[in-house]
Amino acid sequence: MKTQFTVALSMLAGVAVGAVAVQGLHAQAKPPIYLVTEISVTNPEAYGKEFAPKAQATIKAAGGKFVALGGAGGAGAKDIIAIEGTAPKRAVIQQWASMDALMAWYKSADYQAALKIGEKYATFRRYAIEGKE
C-alpha cells in the first residue's frame, strides 16, 4: 500500500512538472513583434541632434532592438531599395518581445516627450507586424 502511494505520488509530481514545462515552452514560442517606421524628415540636423538620440535611448531602455536602419543619414543606415512603388527616404525596423512591450514603450512618458520633439522635424508612419514562430 505504501509503495502504491509512493508510485502514485511520483506520477502526479511528474505530470505536474511536465505541465509546467509545456507551459514554459509555449510561453517561449511567442513570435516577436516588428515595428516598421517610415520617416519623412524636414530638418535632418535638428532631427539627428534633438530627437534621434532620445528616441533610441528609450527604445533600448524598454527592451526594443533595432533590426534595420535605412535611408539618408544616421549611423549605420543602409540604402532603401524600392522593389515596387516608392520607397520612403528613411525607415527603421525594431523588434519587440510582445505587443504589450511595444505599446508600453510607445505610451511611456519618456518616449512621448521625445516624440513631441521629433514631430517638429519629421512625420512618422508606423505599423506593427507579428513575426512567425
Task: Tell where the protein language model's regions lie, with residue ranges.
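Bacterial Sec-dependent N-terminal signal peptides
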Residues: M1-A8
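Alpha-helix boundary/capping residues
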Residues: K54, A109-D110, G118-Y121
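A general structural signal for well-ordered secondary-structure junctions
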Residues: K65, Y111-Q112, F124
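Short, exposed beta-strand-loop hairpins at the edges of beta-sheets
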Residues: M103-A104, A113-G118
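C-terminal end-helix/capping segment
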Residues: G118-E133
